[in-house]
Amino acid sequence: MKKTILILSLLMFSGLVFSQGSPDYGGGLKFNLNPEGTKYMRFIAWNQIWLRSSEMNPGTMIGDEAITKQEDIGLRRLRLLAYAQISPRYMIVTHIGINNQTFINGGASGSGGTGGYGNGKKPGLFFHDAWNEYAVVLPKEEKPFSLSMGAGLHYYMGLSRLTMSSTLNYMTIDAPIFNWPMIENSDQFARQIGIFAKGKYNRFEYRLSLNKPFSTNNVPVDVTNADLARAVDNNHNAKWSKAGYFEYQFFDKESNFLPFKVGTYLGTKKMFNVGAGFYTAPSSTVTSVNGEIEKHATNLFAGDIFVDLPIGNKEKKMAVTGYSVFYSYD
C-alpha cells in the first residue's frame, strides 16, 4: 500500500481556512460597480502547494528508474474565481485554474521529454466553472422561499455534500476522490454543461440540474458469460442526465450563493445538516456479451450527515467536525 505523508499541506490548508476570516482579504477582492455596492465584481484566488514524502508500491518506476521512496513538491491546485453581480438578480461566474503539476506530470497535452514542453511543464489552464444565473425569487430574511436558475458549465451536480465540496476548507488533507464517481469521464472535472435550479425554503435547501454529459466512447471487452461482463463509459450522443441534492439544516443556515460546500467553519457556525442526493444518466454505459452490445443507465444515490459544533473560546475558532456519507453506485 502506498503511504504518503504530506509534510506542509496540513499547515497550508489551515492557513487557507483561517484566511477566510481575514479582515484584509475577507471573501476575496471586491470592486463596486455602483456607489450603492449592489453591482460589483469579486475575485478569489488560492494556491495549494504540496511537499510530499512517499513510500512507493513495489515495481514503481519514475523516468524509467525503479524507486521505493520519493520526495517531491508540486502544485496541487492553482485557482482564480471571479463573479460579477450585474444586478440584484443577475450574476456571471467564471472559475479557472490548474491541478496536479509536478516535476514529472501535469504538463499540457503533448508535453514530454526535455525542453520547453518537457515533462510536467506548462500545464493546461482550463475553465472549471462558467455559468450565468438569474434569481427568480430573491432570497430575503422575511421570506422563506428563494429560487435561482442558471445555465452553463456548473458544479450543481447533486449526489452529496462532498461531491460539491469547496477545495478551500477541507478538514482532511484532501477529498477521497470517490465522491466524484464520473470525474473526467462524462464530466469536465466534476462539472457538466446544463441548466440548474437552486434555492431554499426556511431550513430546507434544494439543488436540481438537467445536463448534457460529455461524450464517451470506451469499448467494452466482449465476454461469453454475462456474469463476467464489465460495463464501460460509452454514451456517444449522450442523453440528458439529471442530478439533485436536498438538505435540511437543523441549526445555523448556510449560504447557497455559490455551490461550493464548506468543509469546516472552525467554530464560526453551529451546523447539523442531513442531506440526500442523486445522479442518473440513461444509456450511459455498455457491455458486450457474445458480440451483442447492451446499454445501461447510471444510477447513483447518496445520503450524508454533516456536523460542525463550536467548542471553547470563540476567538480561538475551535470546533468538532464530523461528516459521514453513504454512496450507492450502479
Language-model segments: which ranges?
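Short, contiguous, pocket-lining structural segments
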Residues: 189, 209, 231-241, 268, ...
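Outer membrane beta-barrel
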Residues: 29-56, 67-216, 238-254
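Short, glycine/acidic-enriched capping/hinge loops at junctions between secondary-structure elements
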Residues: 54-60, 286-289
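Detector for outer-membrane/organellar transmembrane beta-barrel domains
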Residues: 27, 248-330
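Boundary at the C-terminal end of the N-terminal hydrophobic targeting segment
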Residues: 17-21
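Active-site-proximal beta-alpha loop/turn segments in soluble metabolic enzymes
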Residues: 215-233
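Positively charged n-region of N-terminal signal peptides that target proteins for export
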Residues: 1-4
